[in-house]
From Swiss-Prot:
This is Uncharacterized membrane protein VC_0136. Belongs to the Rht family. Keywords: Cell inner membrane, Cell membrane, Membrane, Transmembrane, Transmembrane helix. Its main location: membrane. One of its GO terms (cellular component) is plasma membrane. One of its GO terms (biological process) is homoserine transport. It comes from Vibrio cholerae serotype O1 (strain ATCC 39315 / El Tor Inaba N16961).
Length: 205
């Protein structure tokens, strides 16, 4: 892969990761509630989900999902329902944690599993990657090395961006000591999760 092609994709990957979505909401919410270190599992989970999408695209299943109305709709509704459920749980959280408090509610493993499902049940990501990757792959060269470079770049950039969102939120959380404020923040992020779920429910392949 030529360096100028990779740099163009790098910029695209940054924009893709910075765009607000359920992963962003999850990262900021975790940063506020659990701090940066405890939220690392969630960041890894998001990347596992994203990597699964990339693999599916690479072996051709992603294209089938993008072209199959039934498969897309099924994954879409599962993802939408899961995000709404997460939003309800966040909204009902009456005992928020500050960024400096150790979580007694969700372990890193639990945060990881939640994050994997958030990304894994978002078919819009598959559709986007199916449309995006061919634009940067030279058909006259071996497919897999180029695909591997694009996949590693995508996951690396997204991990950095999600870490940044989490760390910034954790720093903000240090100044939020009031339980009332944290309860309101939980309601805000609960509403955002539900909003992401509703937006996903209206998505089309």
């Amino acid at each position: 892969m030529d360096i100028h092609v990779w740099l163009a994709y790098l910029l695209t990957a940054v924009v893709f990761s910075l765009a607000p979505g359920s992963g962003t909401v999850n990262s900021i919410s975790n940063g506020l509630s659990y701090g940066t270190r405890h939220s690392l599992g969630a960041i890894i989970g998001l990347q596992i989900g994203l990597a699964c999408h990339i693999v599916l695209v690479g072996i051709g299943i992603g294209a089938l999902v993008a072209q199959s109305a039934l498969a897309f709709t099924l994954i879409k509704w599962i993802g939408a329902a899961y995000l709404v459920w997460l939003g309800i749980q966040k909204w009902r959280d009456r005992a928020p944690l500050t960024a400096t408090t150790t979580s007694h509610e969700l372990s890193q493993a639990a945060l990881l599993r939640k994050a994997v499902l958030i990304n894994l049940t978002n078919p819009k990501s598959i559709v986007f990657l199916v449309a995006l990757f061919p634009q940067f792959i030279d058909p006259t060269r071996d497919h897999w090395p180029q695909f591997l470079v694009l996949g590693i770049t995508t996951v690396t950039i997204d991990a950095i961006v999600m870490f940044g969102y989490t760390a910034l939120a954790a720093q903000l959380g240090r100044y939020i000591r009031s339980p009332n404020i944290m309860t309101r923040m939980n309601k805000l992020f609960g509403s955002m999760f539900m909003g992401c779920g509703m937006l996903l429910a209206t998505a089309k392949a």
